[in-house]
Amino acid sequence: MLTENQKNELNKKACKIIKSKGIFKTEMLKKFSPSDVEAIRTSHNLGHHDDSTILHDFESFIDENTLTFSFKLIFMLSMLRLADKEGEVNIDSLIEEYRRFYIERLDRGLPVDRPNCAYNREFLDDLVKVKRSILSNPFEKFERKRFVYYSKDLNILSFHPVLWEQMTQETKDGIRDKEREFLKAYYEKLGGL
C-alpha cells in the first residue's frame, strides 16, 4: 500500500509525462470520488446516463429534433435502413444512401436543404467530402452521446451494442416513423419531400 507522499509523487510524475506529451494543458488531473460525482450531478441538476438509460437517452435525443440542416434525419434513417443484425453499417453504403436523398432532390429541381447548405452537385459527387461531412456532422452528434461508433479500420459505423440490443423492431419502426414525420415537416417550406 502506498503512503500519501508516494501517491502524490506518482501523481506528479504522471502529470509531467502527460504534460510533456501535450495531452493536457493543466498540470493536475481532477479526480472525483463517486460521492463527489453524485453531489455534482445533483447540484447541477444533471441526469444519470449509463447503459441502463441509453435507449431512453437515445429516444429523447431523437424527440428533441434539434436541426440546423436535415443531415441528422437522413443519417439516422439511413443507419436504421442499412444496419445488419449486429447494428453495423458499411460506411460506403451509408454514404451512397445519404447522398442519394440529396441528389434526388437536385434531380427533381428542389432545394437540397436550406440556402446556406454546402451540398450541391459538385459537393455530392465528391465522396471524400461527403464522408468527411457525414463524420463531422451528423455522425459526431450521435457519437458524442455514445449512440454510434466508427471503426475506421473496418469501414463500419455501428450503433452502441447495448442500445442496439435494447431496440426492438417496434422501437426502430417508431423512430423511423418519427424521423420521417420530422423530415416531412422540415421540407414543407422547401418544396416538400
Where are these regions (language model features)?
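Intrinsically disordered, charged low-complexity linkers and terminal tails
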Residues: M1-L193
